[in-house]
Amino acid sequence: MTEDAVGPAFYFDLFSPEAYLAAERVLQTLPVATEWIPVAALGLPAADTLQGFRCETDREAYFDRIARVAERRGLQPLRPPQPFPFDSLFAMRVATYAKQIGRTVPFALAAFRQAFAGGRDLSVPDNVLIAAAACEMHPNAVTKGAALRSVAAALDDATALAARRGVRDVPAVWVPGGEVFHGDEALEQAAQALVA
């Protein structure tokens, strides 16, 4: 991943239910190969931390909306992880390691499904390792890879590049030419921009 990459990029953080919804359809919606780039959403300028629910009713309404979208798209029933939001740093370092070994997409999809269809807290390393094992990543290699300074630096660099490209929150699709499309519902607009 370089500053002058020629193809589009899909930015995600595994703690985001919106990114989960988008991830489940990026491959089918975008008309060209798109690089999946894990970022630490909290390092983006306008990231929604999802900690601002005024009450449990607000939280339930949010997840009800996500559940309706998931059901309409034929996804597995939504099971919000407890606690939510969870600390995704370890999971995002594993996603960065997965990117370095060519397993970004299968790992991200498995991890999103663990979190939002399985109701598993991805701040628990064992839950992340289950997702990694589902895409043939050995637990020892994953644990060692996530602990590398170079992996932490790569995640930081990806987050900084995303911010320079105008990514404010996840999910987001950056297209060559500099346009950024934020949110699950913007995938169709990104697809149109990619064929224009």
Task: Locate predicted features.
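Structural alpha/beta surface segment adjacent to cysteine/selenocysteine redox centers
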Residues: 14, 18-115
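C-terminal cap of thioredoxin/glutaredoxin-like
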Residues: 4-32, 113-196
